[in-house]
Structures are given as structure tokens and as C-alpha cells.
């Protein structure tokens, strides 16, 4: 995508360890996929976008099952969205929506509790392309 800092031809590729080195945060939130409040731990997506030097207005996210969603880059800062790698302190397995899950702090603002933001919350994330 449109990024300034690459580590492969025209792209930035990360493994779990390299993502974690960027710095992790945790928050608790209710969500439509789990009962009660769940603790999610991951990399702030604004930090990841800053790290790669993202230039664009949206990110196209593709999941392992080829589900795609488009997220405005402005969401990442405005809502403190994370790329979660852990749920309740455990790494997320593929069969449990892992290894990477885009999570908003849904119950921090009433506007986040709707289908628009749930649809942006891709799990089993395999690729993100800045457009």
C-alpha cells in the first residue's frame, strides 16, 4: 500500500514478535462476540500506521477467509482501535478469531455500538493495504 517504511519490496511484513515490540495496550469492553466484558491486548493501530508511515485515507483489511472491510484511517486515532493479539491474556488462536483481531473499545462511546463498527472489526486479519 501507500507506506514510507518497508521491510520487503513495497510492503511491511510483521510477525507476532515484531508487532509486540511496537508496544501493547489492553482494554476491557463488551462486544457482540463474547459474553460480558472481555480484555483485549494488542498494538494501537495508530502506532502501527505511524511506524509504517501510512499515507492514505483508508485501510483495506483482508482476513484469512478473504473477508474484506474498509476502515477510515481516522478511526484509529479517534477511537484508539487496536490490532488485538490476546483475549483475556491468551494469544488468540485462528479458530478463536486470531491471530489478529481489529477491536474498537465498543462500550467507551455509544456511537461504537452499531453494525458499522462491528463490520470494521475484522478477525483473522492477514493483510492491511493503505489506500
Which residues make up each language-model segment?
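N-terminal intrinsically disordered, low-complexity segments enriched in P/E/S/T
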Residues: 1-131
